[in-house]
Amino acid sequence: MGDPRRLGKKYDTPNHPWIGERIQKEREISQKYGLVNKKELWKMETQLRNYRRQARKLISDTTTQGGKEAVQLFNVLKRYAILVEQEPTLDHVLSLDIESILERRLQTIVYRKGLAKTAKQARQFIVHGHIAVNGKRVTAPAYLVSVAENDAIEYVPNSPMASENHPERTAAVSEENQ
């Protein structure tokens, strides 16, 4: 029939490819959060850039529609716990950094909860299908976890990792279940 539509890129690359300071910062963030390549980091940076761009647009928009859009933006950011203030303002959105989004990735949360020993191991568990969110297997490490799903992250019941005495399971999880 027809050709499938061409999907656009979900990220913007840096303007200049060889800035040593930026490369060093990206390397540190990639190691801290277990990112495989820079494209993953650039996707999250682009998402943050879009939130900040929307906030800048809404600062100048004083109509009722602008107020509604600001509330919708706050609700999205609160749903994913990217914005944690009780009474958020657009200045809070402008002050967000890349780590506030990276902390909400499934890979990071699995590591922080103690389901994996390292961030890279958390990624492997997710990709291999050992992690479930709300009882559904999720195989995307970049999946943004909402606040409602935060407590529903666990091993898939029929996974070998669900066994208490699996050698790769962390001691923190084994003690928690006893």
UniProtKB/Swiss-Prot annotation:
Keyword Ribosomal protein (UniProt): yes
GO terms for biological process, alphabetical: ribosomal small subunit biogenesis; translation
Signal peptide, first to last residue: none
Keywords: Ribonucleoprotein, Ribosomal protein, RNA-binding, rRNA-binding
Cystines in this chain: none
MF (Gene Ontology): rRNA binding; structural constituent of ribosome
Gene Ontology CC entries for this record: small ribosomal subunit
Cross-referenced Pfam families: S4 (PF01479)
Top-rank taxon, per record: Archaea
InterPro entries in alphabetical order: Ribosomal_uS4 (IPR022801), Ribosomal_uS4_arc (IPR022802), Ribosomal_uS4_CS (IPR018079), Ribosomal_uS4_euk/arc (IPR005710), Ribosomal_uS4_N (IPR001912), S4_RNA-bd (IPR002942), S4_RNA-bd_sf (IPR036986)
Annotated stretches, region: Disordered: 158-178
Domain S4 RNA-binding: 104-166
Residue runs in coiled coils: none
Function: One of the primary rRNA binding proteins, it binds directly to 16S rRNA where it nucleates assembly of the body of the 30S subunit. With S5 and S12 plays an important role in translational accuracy.
Family under the similarity heading: Belongs to the universal ribosomal protein uS4 family.
NCBIfam families named among the record's database cross-references: PRK04051.1, uS4_arch
Self-association and partners: Part of the 30S ribosomal subunit. Contacts protein S5. The interaction surface between S4 and S5 is involved in control of translational fidelity.
Name recorded for this polypeptide: Small ribosomal subunit protein uS4
Species, as recorded: Methanococcus maripaludis (strain C6 / ATCC BAA-1332)
